[in-house]
Amino acid sequence: MVKKIGVLTSGGDAPGMNAAVRGVVRTALTEGLEVFGIHDGYLGLVEDRIEKLERHSVSDMINRGGTFLGSARFPEFKEVAVREKAIENLKKHDIDALIVIGGDGSYMGAKKLTEMGYPCIGLPGTIDNDIAGTDYTIGYLTALNTVIDAIDRLRDTSSSHQRISIVEVMGRHCGDLTLMSAIAGGCEYVITPETGLNKEALIQNIQDGIAKGKKHAIIAITELMTDVNQLAKEIEAETGRETRATVLGHIQRGGQPGAFDRILASRMGNYGVKLLIDGHGGRCVGIQNEQLVHHDIIDAIENMRRPEKLELYKVAEELF
């Protein structure tokens, strides 16, 4: 029977992580459990940065961006000896189970602990929206609004100067944030890992638009696909139209979470605790068709795939 649980945030931060921690803490205390916050992710777990949390510990946190527990990337957690040290620290505090809030790397750590017999629950916290088994991740929709706001501002100046603007959006190997922001921001072109980058076709499309009287354009592209500053130079050389690249970077991770992310994070935090109380371990939480669900975390990482957004790409193509 679970009496004490730990909670940590890991990997890249996302708006709504604090709301998720709050959901975990308040639910656990209401259910008569003790809660321990682990600072700086798996690194803090190994280094025993663990403190008991009370209701007041998460007061005034639901509206704050970032994560008050701190986060860190800790690749050394892949090593068995390092994970054994982590479990040793959990046992030292009599912590029976762990809730991990983060992205795919964080899930991998929870998976490894699960395989070593330690019950973990994963909550999807990442702006990339790249986690299998959920329609939305905590922080994604807030980041989407941040990107759209930037695109709106770029459109103002691009139209004033008859300029082509390239906007680099986060997402790594997932184009969801780029695709949705391109549709909502009215971008003329969208390039994601799912579509690939065809420079010749892109430049030809831009030239065709100019020939039809297009005065300016915005291109949304997912990070890591190419050097956007070099791409801007190539487009300007081929089209004769001034072209500039804007890398939004880590601004996409910051800021107050929107209402949707606050509610989603609160629901997921509450649900994660209930799963542990019901005897479930080694699970990851998701939301599908507006319903909270849970999956085997090992199966989710190894076998589940995110559905392709073919309909949305078709919409984007027809609107652009």
Curated annotation (Swiss-Prot):
Catalyzes the phosphorylation of D-fructose 6-phosphate to fructose 1,6-bisphosphate by ATP, the first committing step of glycolysis. Mg(2+) binds at D104. The keyword Transferase applies. This is ATP-dependent 6-phosphofructokinase. CDD domains: Bacterial_PFK. ATP binds at G12, R73, F74, G103, D104, G105, S106. InterPro entries: ATP_PFK, ATP_PFK_prok-type, PFKA_ATP_prok, Phosphofructokinase_CS, Phosphofructokinase_dom, PKF_sf. ADP binds at R22, G23, V24, V25, R26, R155, G186, C187, E188, K212, K214, K215, H216. Belongs to the phosphofructokinase type A (PFKA) family. ATP-dependent PFK group I subfamily. Prokaryotic clade 'B1' sub-subfamily. Its cofactor is Mg(2+).
